[in-house]
């Protein structure tokens, strides 16, 4: 404004995802410079935004994602940062590239978009700026929330449940595992059909209608329900077959041992080390979904059956709960459980609690258990220890201050440091390095052949 109060120029600003500040302020223009109208400027800005959208489409091949976590201000249990780290690991398993993360603490979620509108817009601008094409929320979104956020963001939005379903679908190998995952996916989809709109064509393409007045949505719901029914029938048949196999093993009177633990605790690596087998043991969450069974032979021609199982996880999605528990049903016939714990994980105590909670829900907490604290080679304190081999070639560890023996004092000290009862049925191992396996096998043999059922069977034979 000049001294007379008349305009002598103007400034303009607009959102700009390509700028570090997410906006741009244009230079001041004077009345004599107004050769273009405001409309032309707006069209130029929209053209630049369109180019950003093109870059976004090019990025879709990389599965670039932005993670969003909304947690109560005073959360009980796991710290939000640990929950977000687990979500990152889930993304890595699903081959999703995490570009950035966002954590907000608030006690009341926005019923329509979870986050407040302003915060959501900030995230969307940042996502466009970094060429992100996927938002992953660390909670289960309602169908209306997912649709609302996707409409506002104009990019794909999924929640933790969908991510886990995708991982299960990738990793299931057996017929039973694949059917369980498909059933879980369909049950998840069924409750969200009313929100799918344009996506319905993918579900109903090529399917004939029930009648001239039936909509695509009605066709979709009916077909999903029919498929769910068929899957449940087939899964019941497979369950009967598994029961027959378990009865056969019982008749052979071979002791059964089940390995349980949080996902990525190293269960498959542990079983591989014990049995010299080659079960897939990637450093990813849910690398194992289908139960795997092997045999271990002890002296005096004594054998046991030992089985690996799917890893446990916090807050398992309801749609996967039945599928997950079905894969664990064989644990009910176990004479002994082996709980493998990743002791190097800062969240390991809460992970142990999650496993124990699920075992209680499955009514398996009465089964005797050995705890295996795995990955001790990742502990900073352990890196100063020596590695030795006994006369049979088994690797053991000792503290530098101990010149002879397997380092029992140092192990006892470390157990005490970790809050483990020195006299409890707990062993420290590194399955990856092969350390501590002899101590585990000795304890396993002692426990398994002192079980009441086995003593009774031996007495009967005598």
From Swiss-Prot:
For molecular function, the Gene Ontology terms on record are: GTP binding; GTPase activity; metal ion binding; ribosome binding
Q: Where does Mg(2+) bind?
A: 268, 288
Q: Which GO terms describe its cellular component?
A: cytoplasm
Q: Identify the keywords attached in UniProt to this record, alphabetized.
A: Cytoplasm, GTP-binding, Magnesium, Metal-binding, Nucleotide-binding
Kindly report the protein's main subcellular placement as a broad class.
cytoplasm
The compartments listed are:
Cytoplasm
Which annotated residues bind GTP? 261-268, 286-290, 308-311, 374-377, 430-432
What's a Pfam family in this record? MMR_HSR1
| Residue span(s) of domain Hflx-type G | 255-452
Return the PROSITE patterns for the record: G_HFLX
* Cofactor annotation: Mg(2+)
Q: Which family does the entry's similarity section mention?
A: Belongs to the TRAFAC class OBG-HflX-like GTPase superfamily. HflX GTPase family.
- Tell me the subunit arrangement: Monomer. Associates with the 50S ribosomal subunit.
The record's function comment reads: GTPase that associates with the 50S ribosomal subunit and may have a role during protein synthesis or ribosome biogenesis.
NCBIfam families to which the protein is assigned, alphabetical: GTP_HflX (TIGR03156), small_GTP (TIGR00231)
User: What is the protein's given name?
Assistant: GTPase HflX
Upper classification of the source organism reads: Bacteria, Pseudomonadati, Spirochaetota, Spirochaetia, Leptospirales
């Amino acid at each position: 404004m000049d001294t007379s109060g008349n305009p002598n120029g103007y400034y303009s600003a607009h959102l700009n995802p390509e700028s570090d500040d997410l906006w741009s302020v244009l230079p001041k223009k004077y009345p004599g410079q107004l050769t273009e109208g405001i409309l032309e400027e707006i069209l130029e800005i929209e053209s630049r935004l369109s180019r950003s959208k093109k870059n976004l489409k090019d990025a879709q091949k990389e599965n670039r994602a932005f993670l969003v976590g909304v947690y109560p201000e005073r959360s009980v249990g796991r710290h939000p940062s640990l929950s977000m780290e687990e979500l990152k690991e889930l993304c890595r398993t699903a081959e999703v590239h995490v570009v950035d993360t966002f954590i907000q603490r608030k006690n009341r979620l926005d019923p329509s978009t979870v986050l407040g509108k302003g915060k959501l817009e900030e995230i969307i601008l940042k996502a466009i700026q970094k060429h992100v094409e996927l938002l992953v929320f660390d909670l289960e979104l309602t169908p209306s929330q997912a649709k609302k956020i996707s409409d506002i963001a104009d990019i794909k939005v999924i929640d933790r449940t969908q991510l886990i379903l995708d991982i299960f679908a990738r990793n299931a190998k057996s017929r039973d595992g694949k059917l369980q995952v498909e059933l879980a996916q369909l049950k998840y989809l069924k409750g969200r059909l009313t929100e799918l709109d344009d996506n319905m064509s993918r579900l109903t393409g090529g399917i004939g209608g029930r009648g001239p007045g039936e909509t695509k949505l009605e066709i979709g719901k009916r077909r999903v329900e029919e498929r769910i029914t068929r899957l449940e029938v087939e899964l019941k048949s497979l369950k009967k077959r598994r029961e027959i196999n378990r009865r056969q093993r019982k008749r052979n009177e071979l002791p059964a041992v089940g390995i349980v633990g949080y996902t990525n605790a190293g269960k498959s690596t542990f079983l591989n080390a014990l049995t010299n087998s080659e079960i897939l043991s990637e450093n990813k969450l849910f690398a194992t979904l289908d139960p795997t069974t092997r045999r271990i032979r002890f002296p005096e021609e004594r054998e046991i059956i030992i089985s690996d199982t799917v890893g446990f996880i916090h807050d398992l999605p309801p749609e996967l709960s039945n599928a997950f528990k079905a894969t664990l049903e064989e644990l009910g016939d176990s004479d002994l459980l082996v709980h493998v714990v990743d002791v190097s994980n800062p969240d390991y105590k809460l992970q142990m609690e999650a496993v124990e909670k699920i075992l209680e829900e499955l009514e398996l907490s009465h089964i005797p258990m050995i705890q295996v604290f795995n990955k001790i080679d990742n502990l900073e304190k352990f890196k100063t220890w020596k590695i030795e081999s006994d006369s049979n070639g088994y690797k053991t560890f000792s503290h530098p201050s101990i010149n002879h023996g397997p380092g029992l004092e140092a192990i006892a000290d470390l157990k005490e440091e970790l809050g483990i009862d020195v006299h409890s049925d707990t062993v420290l191992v590194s399955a990856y390095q092969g350390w501590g396996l002899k101590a585990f096998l000795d304890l396993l043999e002692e426990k398994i052949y002192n079980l009441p059922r086995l003593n009774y069977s031996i007495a009967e034979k005598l």
